[in-house]
Swiss-Prot record:
This is Beta-arrestin-1. The modification Phosphoserine is found at S404. InterPro entries: Arrestin, Arrestin-like_C, Arrestin-like_N, Arrestin_C-like, Arrestin_CS, Arrestin_N, Ig_E-set. Residues 1-163 are annotated as: Interaction with SRC. Residues 45-86 are annotated as: Interaction with CHRM2. Belongs to the arrestin family. The [DE]-X(1,2)-F-X-X-[FL]-X-X-X-R motif mediates interaction the AP-2 complex subunit AP2B1. Binding to phosphorylated GPCRs induces a conformationanl change that exposes the motif to the surface. The N-terminus binds InsP6 with low affinity. Functions in regulating agonist-mediated G-protein coupled receptor (GPCR) signaling by mediating both receptor desensitization and resensitization processes. During homologous desensitization, beta-arrestins bind to the GPRK-phosphorylated receptor and sterically preclude its coupling to the cognate G-protein; the binding appears to require additional receptor determinants exposed only in the active receptor conformation. It comes from Oryctolagus cuniculus (Rabbit).
Length: 410
């Protein structure tokens, strides 16, 4: 898309009086800072009359099923809420325009007004917990929403006809410099055996991209008089739910149970390959997945990267992965080691420089809503939200009663 112009996502209110424009739907967390959420809102001043236009950014953690919300009590906690008054522009909310905002205001005209939000790095990334087959309503997890609406003040009830809601996501990508190869070893002494059993395991690298096979090297030195009957290899996802207190959930996402045996006074060495796929884990309720946008599929949640000492500050869901290697020993119990690793998407390649479109060339894209091939080549595309099985789409959500965003609701 980069060679056809700058893609800009748009979404209008049901009555068409407010339209929000965003340059992207995923905002990257660089550990120390997060990409700013910058966009513009196009308003109809004649429709607004004496009312104002507000834009709100909310990071929320839904930790219970939506159908269990009763008596005004919801299983949801707002982790972050920020408001700006976009129209008329409030002096305290004025910030320098980004390049995207300058271009959009130039293109859309005098009734386009900017808004910018800074996402604190300590906020969690967008994560969805996979619903069970019988679950209905919005899935549990962490999501981010930009909402624009017109009202006389922030306390006023928000009506769906003159409001716009867009779900965005906060994402992280794999670091460019991987850590050392994960290795682990353990030695176990058994009763009635003078010498020990030694297990050593390692991975071929520390960072794996989604869909890549994980190579596990296993080396066993069995100097005991016992037999290793079986070797079990598993990839486990750990999700730390940090809210009122911290609870950890673990879920195997790939497993291999090999009938390899290691006789007494012998050694064994073998390489195993496992590839964790969401497709093989569709029925596991509570499995952490990457936050979604639009109606495309997602994947297992990426590992969470944090600054040193930041784990005590973060609320939400922290995801990590480990490979577990377990030896089943006859009449002796199990011997096991764990190898932590990172599972993420690679950092996308930088978009190529903007190219002016020749006069005789017209960009063609089936998903385009508007396009302009003149001085500022901006392509407008409908902002469509992704959803998981069991989640309601935008139309159904807009039929819900929408409360007013307040900072003291946190």
């Amino acid at each position: 898309m980069g060679d056809k112009g700058t893609r800009v996502f748009k979404k209008a209110s049901p009555n068409g009086k407010l339209t929000v424009y965003l340059g992207k739907r995923g905002f990257v967390d660089h550990i120390d800072l997060v990409d700013p959420v910058d966009g513009v809102v196009l308003v109809d001043p004649e429709y607004l009359k004496e009312r104002r236009v507000y834009v709100t950014l909310t990071c929320a953690f839904r930790y219970g099923r939506e159908d269990l919300d009763v008596l005004g009590l919801t299983f949801r906690k707002d982790l972050f809420v920020a408001n700006v008054q976009s129209f008329p522009p409030a002096p305290e909310d004025k910030k320098p325009l980004t390049r995207l905002q300058e271009r959009l205001i130039k293109k859309l005209g005098e009734h386009a007004y900017p808004f910018t939000f800074e996402i604190p790095p300590k906020l969690p990334c967008s994560v969805t917990l996979q619903p069970g087959p019988e679950d209905t309503g919005k899935a549990c997890g962490v999501d981010y929403e930009v909402k624009a609406f017109c009202a006389e003040n922030l306390e006023e009830k928000i009506h769906k006809r003159n409001s716009v809601r867009l779900v965005i996501r906060k994402v992280q990508y794999a670091p460019e410099r991987p850590g050392p190869h994960p290795t682990a070893e353990t030695t176990r002494l058994f009763l009635m055996s003078d010498k020990p059993l030694h297990l050593e395991a390692s991975l071929d690298k520390e960072i794996y991209y989604h869909g890549e096979p994980i190579i596990v090297n296993v080396h066993v030195t069995n100097n005991t008089n016992k037999t290793v009957k079986k070797i079990k290899i598993s990839v486990r996802q750990y999700a730390d739910i940090c809210l009122f207190n911290t609870a950890q959930y673990k879920c195997p996402v790939a497993m291999e149970e090999a009938d390899d045996t290691v006789a007494p006074s012998s050694t064994f060495c073998k390489v195993y390959t496992l590839t964790p796929f969401l497709a093989n884990n569709r029925e596991k309720r509570g499995l952490a997945l990457d936050g979604k946008l639009k109606h495309e599929d997602t994947n297992l949640a990426s590992s969470t990267l944090m600054r040193e000492g930041a784990n005590r500050e973060i609320l939400g869901i922290i995801v990590s992965y480990k490979v577990k290697v377990k030896l089943v020993v006859s009449r002796g119990g199990d011997v096991a080691v764990e190898l932590p690793f990172t599972l993420m998407h690679p950092k996308p390649k930088e978009e190529p420089p903007h190219r002016e479109v020749p006069e005789n060339e017209t960009p063609v894209d089936t998903n385009l809503i508007e396009l302009d091939t003149n001085d500022d080549d901006i392509v407008f595309e409908d902002f469509a939200r992704q959803r998981l099985k069991g989640m309601k789409d935008d139309k159904e959500e807009e039929d819900d009663v929408t409360g007013s965003p307040r900072l003291n609701d946190r």
